[in-house]
Amino acid sequence: MRKSIAIIGGSIAGLSAALFFASAKNEELDFDITVFDEGKADLKAAAIYNVPFFPKGAKADEIYTHIKAQIASMLEVKYIDSKVVSISGEKGDFTVNDEQGLGIKADYIIVATGANKSDIKELEDFVIPHELIPKPNKFCFKHHGRQIIKEGIYAAGLASGVTTMVACAMGSANEAACAMGSANEAACAILSDIKGAVSVYHDTPTTRN
């Protein structure tokens, strides 16, 4: 079985979701992953000191390069440097349209566009103020259940209403609800929907031997 996933937003949340799907690929389930990104992520203005496993003071490009290399070792992903302007269709038959006129088909969509206001057509009615970021003009998507904006479309990262772009649920020193964690939750929710039962994926030391 092969499922297509469009990820709108290629910063830490979007790439974390792509990495989850890459690791979950097996003989029974494969993925076509397309990541759209405008290149305007807030992470580009940050240096990361509070997340384990990243080099101290890691910058956005260093983080992106590392995650993309990890993804590429398991799955070929298509990256498109473009803004998504509209979504049409329904779960299992979406079309994601970008500003260049490209239309990508997808079974599922993850929206990880950060906290700036989204003007993606068909999602306008779901945009609400982001109440956990103490800055003006910050927004997220109204969602329910497992970060479902509407059937087949999931919010991740700041767009899901969490308060930090990078830090994970690793204790009181970091935010419990976070971009990478919410992205993996969205990916787990999609995997569960595909399999028809609550599903997660973890490797063991011998999984890939």
Go through each PLM region and give its residues.
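N-terminal Rossmann-like dinucleotide/flavin-binding domain of flavoprotein oxidoreductases
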Residues: A46-G103
